[in-house]
Design a protein with these regions (language model features):
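N-terminal Lys/Arg-rich, disordered targeting/topogenic segments
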Residues: 1-2
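Hydrophobic membrane-insertion alpha-helices, especially the h-region
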Residues: 5-23
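Catalytic glycan-binding domains that act on GlcNAc-containing polysaccharides
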Residues: 20-189
């Protein structure tokens, strides 16, 4: 067989293998980063102006889409809301009176979790600050922003310098998941 034909055959095989590998990786990524509760996520991300990919990433990171998840500190549901945060949101911001057991309901949990992200965004220009506050608390983020060790401009955090390891890792993990969701579902090829 002539050398040129061998090169062409190897090139075609390499290209086919590349496409199959990429297809397989995307298939695995879609299994590990699913689109669940789409109706609720689209509804509340639009209503409260929070990027859909970010909401999916928070749910993936917080509960891996397990609506009955409960953390060791008592956070409940898909977006792992603390009962006290839920009560504060429902009574003081949305003038509703709901039982904390409603946090197990996917739509309820997504609605109030997305509202909470949106509310935190009113304090910060940066989604990383929002995520840090969602995980580590508003007061802590405000203190970090005032400290040059953690913020160079008083508006954004230096992620690798967030003093709480859990919060630092949380922000990184959500960002990674958000990038994956953007790539898989929300960007045009």
């Amino acid at each position: 067989m002539p050398y040129g034909k061998i090169v062409i055959i190897l090139l075609v095989i390499s290209i086919a293998f590349g496409f199959l590998f990429d297809w397989g990786c995307n298939l695995i990524d879609k299994k590990t980063h699913p689109l669940r509760y789409t109706e609720f996520i689209e509804k509340y991300s639009e209503k409260y102006k929070v990027p859909k990919a970010l909401v999916y990433a928070v749910i993936k990171t917080e509960s891996d889409f397990e609506s009955n998840a409960v953390s060791p500190v008592g956070a409940i549901g898909l977006m792992q809301l603390m009962p006290s945060t839920f009560e504060d949101i429902t009574k003081n911001f949305l003038s509703e009176n709901l039982e904390t057991g409603m946090l197990y309901d996917p739509e309820t949990n997504i609605k109030y979790g997305v509202f909470y992200l949106s509310w935190l965004k009113t304090f910060y220009d940066d989604w990383n600050c929002v995520l840090a506050a969602y995980n580590g608390g508003l007061g802590n983020v405000n203190n970090w922003l005032k400290d040059e060790e953690y913020s160079e401009d008083g508006k954004t955090l230096i992620i690798d310098k967030i003093p709480f390891k859990e919060t630092r890792n949380y922000v990184k993990k959500v960002n990674k998941a958000e990038e994956k969701y953007e790539k898989l579902y929300f960007t045009e090829d």
